[in-house]
């Protein structure tokens, strides 16, 4: 195989050819030295976030075909004055020191209630120290319970009418959290009708009040102007005391009007008594700013309407009570009830709300735990800056840091190659590199042709055939299921007594060989049985299964189709095999199958007679050769294949292979390169255009919603088989990145799978996944049946695995 090595800055990239997956990192460093002129001790190699260390192989790091390894050049230790040859990684001297979290301001850090019970007159201003007030959040417009912490004179800049908060920012509360907003919101409430005594406010403009919110002590001390303060509301108005036009304080949730929220000033617009217990109250909410009003707002808490207190009212302190109003509960499950156990807002294990000072909050999922409810329990609250619960904590022992040894996976430890004493280098074969992509246009158990793959398509390696979905196994000759049937097979001339007549050939089943350990090939050592893949291929015959004498189909065309791929390895027994690569030859049917003694090795084998049943001409016929020329079918190479290898024959190709060798499962370790490399300039003739059926043309005209897309797609008809690739790209779901299934054509003319759109709506995302056009919560998803029928015609079988 081959890999690429690129410098960390991307300035230089080189391809390392003929590298084995069993190659050690030391061997790789020598190859890099030859290409980049960087000594091994100066190399730092990275792959997928891991630093490659000596003592391991490319297989240990899962380096695959055409993967990129990054190279970082270390300073040469021999040219560094006063340093040893070993360079140790030290912490950067200018790294910022670790800052310890400031202690959270909580009830334990507040002055005692007895110390705050006494009112202190500062000698100026309307309000006294420790007085209970309502403070207006200048960014939100809502009123919150607070108390005066201290009173100071305003500076010259503050006395000119500005009301900045501490640090020049205002606060916005959402679900109990405080978010800072810009200074632009500080004067948004100037146009709201003031409910305070204007004379008192005018006389108190040069005073700054330092307040603390009672329910949000973590916000600290904030600076407030007198116009954003008023005495604490204490009087609940009865229904018969309310009148239209009154300005009162009500509870309202701006985001969810049907739930409890914050407290706002509001003007009553509608009072309606429906029954003795059912009343309707509608108000105009004052949010702040010139346009900060909400009209026709229905209030759900009609029994909690507070009278607005004017400056000069009797001052309240903590000695008179807390006078706290009910806000939106922080937890919807328990309603904020301190006596009710809740596993959502309290300890996840016991649900208790006791001993909050012994609860730890996970910095990842924000879930609380008592230190004694953990497993194992903790003796005290940890002093670390960050703490993570057991479900979020990453096991540091599983993290491989730079310079550390790899932790071998259990899967690799069980592989035969991990325990074998053989020194055979199996890592050079293309059958060992693994797929770089997977065919998803049809499921793996698809019978019949693969959409977009015409007869005569040829690939350089077997792994490419697997990626195209024509024959999924990298090595095995038969792909199928013993309880379903066979989907494809590879004719590679593994048995000398097989007969190939082109449109009809005999095929020998698999098994009967000792492939213990990590073997890929082996001599026959036992009789074959009609099990596993042999049984799967027999099920394709239109006859009852018989594992004794075999069977012959009643109507061979009625059998299940099998995709046949001829390999260049079959050239030794068949003139119909390609000279290079692996060629798709179309659909065959099983005519009959029977057991017999092989003339080459004397063991019992199962034979199958397959006959061609395909509308496309065979690639060895004159019609097939002409069609391949019109479709410009070329030998396909993998991405990144070294260009200097094209057209060259590798070592060992000219060696004569012994006759009678049995190679059913065979790798591509020694497969020859293409003897002829086709290029686009070899033929100046136009590619045969893709032909639409009358039914497809009619349905395309009927699909008016996607007319623009169809116009673009139909312009690629002249590209032949590439038309289907363009069609797949144009109708790909933006969510699952697959061809749309049960497509919903939105009002913005985008196509999305119905299941994908339903998952989006379930996640409360009610917009088009492609353009974010708002579809609305009540959007009706109607599948585009015309488009679904068209896609089934172009890609038969693709919806089977969805």
UniProtKB/Swiss-Prot annotation:
Reaction catalysed by this enzyme: S-ubiquitinyl-[E2 ubiquitin-conjugating enzyme]-L-cysteine + [acceptor protein]-L-lysine = [E2 ubiquitin-conjugating enzyme]-L-cysteine + N(6)-ubiquitinyl-[acceptor protein]-L-lysine
UniProt GO BP: cell differentiation; negative regulation of gene expression via chromosomal CpG island methylation; protein autoubiquitination; protein sumoylation; protein ubiquitination; regulation of cell cycle; regulation of transcription by RNA polymerase II
Subcellular location: Nucleus; Chromosome
Regulation: E3 ligase activity is robustly activated by 5-hydroxymethylcytosine.
Leading EC class: transferase
Main location: nucleus
Renumbered residue ranges of the record's region Disordered: 80-116, 153-197, 640-674
PTM annotation (Phosphoserine): residues: 667
Disorder named in the UniProt entry: Associated with various cancers. DNA copy number loss is found in multiple kinds of malignancies originating from the brain, breast, stomach, kidney, hematopoietic tissue and lung.
Subunit structure: Homodimer; disulfide-linked. Binds methylated CpG containing oligonucleotides. Interacts with H3; the interaction has a preference for the 'Lys-9' trimethylated form of H3 (H3K9me3). Interacts with PCNP. Interacts with HDAC1. Interacts directly with CCNE1; the interaction ubiquitinates CCNE1 and appears independent of CCNE1 phosphorylation. Interacts with CCND1; the interaction ubiquitinates CCND1 and appears independent of CCND1 phosphorylation. Interacts with p53/TP53 and RB1. Interacts with UBE2I. Interacts with ZNF618. Interacts with UHRF1. Interacts with FANCD2. Interacts with ATR.
Protein name: E3 ubiquitin-protein ligase UHRF2
Stored SMART domains: PHD, RING, SRA, UBQ
PTM description: May be autoubiquitinated; which may lead to proteasomal degradation.
Organism annotation: Homo sapiens (Human)
């Amino acid at each position: 195989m081959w890999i690429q090595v690129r410098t960390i800055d991307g300035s230089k990239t080189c391809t390392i050819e003929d590298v084995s997956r069993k190659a050690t990192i030391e061997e790789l460093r020598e190859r890099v030295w030859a290409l980049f002129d960087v000594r091994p001790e100066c190399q730092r190699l990275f792959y997928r976030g891991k630093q490659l260390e000596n003592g391991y192989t490319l297989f240990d790091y899962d380096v695959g075909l055409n993967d990129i390894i990054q190279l970082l050049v270390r300073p040469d230790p021999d040219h560094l004055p006063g340093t040893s040859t070993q360079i140790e990684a030290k912490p950067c001297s200018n790294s910022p020191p670790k800052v310890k979290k400031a202690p959270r301001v909580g009830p334990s850090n507040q002055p005692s209630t007895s110390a705050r019970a006494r009112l202190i007159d500062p000698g100026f201003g309307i309000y006294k120290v420790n007085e209970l007030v309502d403070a207006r959040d200048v960014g939100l417009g809502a009123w919150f319970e607070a108390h005066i912490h201290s009173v100071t004179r305003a500076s010259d800049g503050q006395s000119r009418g500005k009301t900045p908060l501490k640090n020049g920012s205002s606060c916005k509360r959402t679900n109990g959290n405080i978010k800072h907003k810009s200074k632009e919101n500080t004067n948004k409430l100037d146009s709201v009708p003031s409910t305070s005594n204007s004379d008192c406010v005018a006389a108190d403009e040069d005073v700054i009040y330092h307040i603390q919110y009672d329910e949000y002590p973590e916000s600290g001390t904030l600076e407030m102007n007198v116009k954003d303060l008023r005495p604490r509301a204490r009087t609940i108005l009865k229904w018969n005391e309310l009148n239209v036009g009154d300005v009162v304080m009500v509870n309202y949730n701006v985001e969810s009007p049907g739930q409890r929220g914050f407290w706002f000033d509001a003007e009553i617009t509608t009072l309606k008594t429906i029954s003795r217990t059912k009343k309707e109250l509608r108000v105009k909410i004052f949010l702040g700013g010139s346009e900060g009003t909400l009209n026709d707002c229905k209030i759900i808490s009609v029994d909690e309407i507070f009278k607005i207190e004017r400056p000069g009212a009797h001052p309240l302190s903590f000695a008179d009570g807390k006078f706290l109003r009910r806000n939106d509960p922080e937890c919807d499950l328990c309603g904020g009830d301190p006596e009710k156990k809740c596993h959502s807002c309290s300890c996840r294990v016991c649900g208790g709300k006791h001993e909050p000072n012994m609860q730890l909050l996970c910095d990842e999922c924000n879930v609380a735990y008592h230190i004694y409810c953990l497993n194992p329990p903790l003796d005290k609250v940890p002093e670390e800056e960050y703490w993570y619960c057991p479900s979020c904590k990453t096991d540091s022992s599983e993290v491989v840091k730079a310079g550390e040894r790899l932790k071998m996976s259990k899967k690799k430890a069980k592989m035969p190659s991990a325990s074998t004493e053989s020194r055979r280098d199996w890592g050079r074969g293309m059958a060992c590199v693994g797929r770089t992509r997977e065919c998803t246009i049809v499921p793996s158990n698809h019978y019949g042709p693969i959409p977009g793959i015409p007869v005569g398509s040829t690939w350089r390696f077997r792994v490419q055939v697997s990626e195209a979905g024509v024959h999924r196994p990298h090595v095995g000759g038969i792909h199928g299921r013993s309880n379903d049937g066979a989907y494809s097979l590879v004719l590679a001339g593994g048995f000398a007594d097989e007969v190939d007549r082109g449109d009809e050939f005999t095929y020998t089943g698999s098994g009967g060989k000792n492939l213990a350990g990590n073997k890929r090939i082996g001599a026959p050592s036992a009789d074959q049985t009609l099990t596993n893949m042999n049984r799967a291929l027999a099920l394709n015959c239109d006859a009852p299964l018989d594992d004794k004498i075999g069977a012959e189909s009643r109507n061979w065309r009625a059998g299940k189709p099998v995709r046949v791929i001829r390999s260049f390895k079959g050239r030794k027994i068949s003139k119909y095999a390609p000279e290079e690569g692996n060629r798709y030859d179309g659909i065959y049917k099983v005519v009959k199958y029977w057991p017999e003694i092989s003339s080459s090795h004397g063991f019992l084998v199962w034979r199958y007679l397959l006959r061609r049943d395909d509308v496309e001409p065979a690639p060895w016929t004159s019609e097939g050769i002409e069609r391949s020329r019109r479709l410009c079918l070329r030998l396909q190479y993998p991405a990144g294949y070294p260009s200097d290898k094209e057209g060259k024959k590798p070592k060992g190709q000219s060696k004569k292979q012994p006759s009678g060798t049995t190679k059913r499962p065979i790798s591509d370790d020694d497969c020859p390169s293409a003897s002829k490399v086709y290029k686009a300039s070899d033929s100046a003739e136009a590619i045969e255009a893709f032909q639409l059926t009358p039914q497809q043309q009619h349905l395309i005209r009927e699909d008016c919603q996607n007319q623009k897309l169809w116009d673009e797609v139909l312009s690629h008809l002249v590209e032949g088989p590439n038309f289907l690739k363009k069609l797949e790209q144009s109708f790909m779901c933006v969510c699952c990145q697959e061809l749309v299934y049960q497509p919903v054509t939105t009002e913005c003319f985008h196509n999305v799978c119905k299941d994908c759109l339903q998952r989006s709506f379930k996640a409360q995302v009610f917009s088009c996944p492609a353009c974010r056009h708002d579809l609305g919560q009540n959007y009706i998803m109607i599948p585009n049946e015309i488009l679904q029928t068209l896609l089934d015609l172009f890609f038969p079988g693709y919806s089977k695995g969805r």
